Amino acid sequence: MKHPIITLTSDFGVQSQGIGIMEGVALEINPEAHVIHLMHGLPDFNLFYAARTMETVSYMPVGYHVCVVDPGVGTKRKPIIIETGRGDFLIGPDNGVLIPATRFLGGIKKVVEITNEKYMKKPISPIFHGRDIFTPAAAYLSKGVKIGEFGKELKPEELAKAPYEEAITEEDKIHAKIISINKFGSLHLNITHSAWDKCGAELN
């Protein structure tokens, strides 16, 4: 891809200089990349909202998608890369926030823990992994570095669980959760199109 797509999502708030810093880090590594700021106004540390937002990268071109909603930053939680069946790479903390998106991107193909400091920005801050670990990983991947170069492979079942599961279908019923409510009052549920179709209902 001549101009690979890197998306950035965080709970930093639009006033944060961290947003521009992450874009700068990405472009320093790969000046040919095109950076899309998907969302930076997520509620602080809210994994539900963040996971729901990451689902929408399915509307983006195949690319490298970073999520920095990370209440466990500074702890032993793992930084990870998930390669999906569609060909996207999801980069962020192992706190479940990336898992729901994989259901819309062809499932999980491969997972690695990011441990190779060759592909990190130094000095590595214990509290700004978005700048020093996640964004550099996305940028190096977009330049063609193979996922296996970043660290050891993990099994999908080793990963932290998603903040919510898929809705449960039962004949003509769906048991769902409200994931978020936008400012217009629209509800976002954990219902996929295929689950909705099974119930024979119309979806707007």
Predicted regions and their residues:
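Short, solvent-exposed amphipathic alpha-helices that sit
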Residues: 18-26, 182
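Residue-level recognition of beta-strand->loop/alpha-helix junctions
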Residues: 37-39
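Active-site histidine-anchored catalytic micro-motif
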Residues: 4, 17, 29-34, 43-49, ...
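Short, intrinsically disordered, charge-balanced linker/junction segments flanking boundaries
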Residues: 58-61, 199-204
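Extreme N-terminus of proteins, especially the signal/transit-peptide cleavage junction
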Residues: 1-4, 169-171
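N-terminal signal-anchor module of multipass membrane proteins
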Residues: 7-14, 19
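Short, glycine/acidic-enriched loop or turn micro-motifs at the edges of active sites
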Residues: 14, 73, 185
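Anionic-ligand-binding alpha/beta catalytic cores of soluble enzymes and soluble regulatory domains
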Residues: 121-191, 195, 200
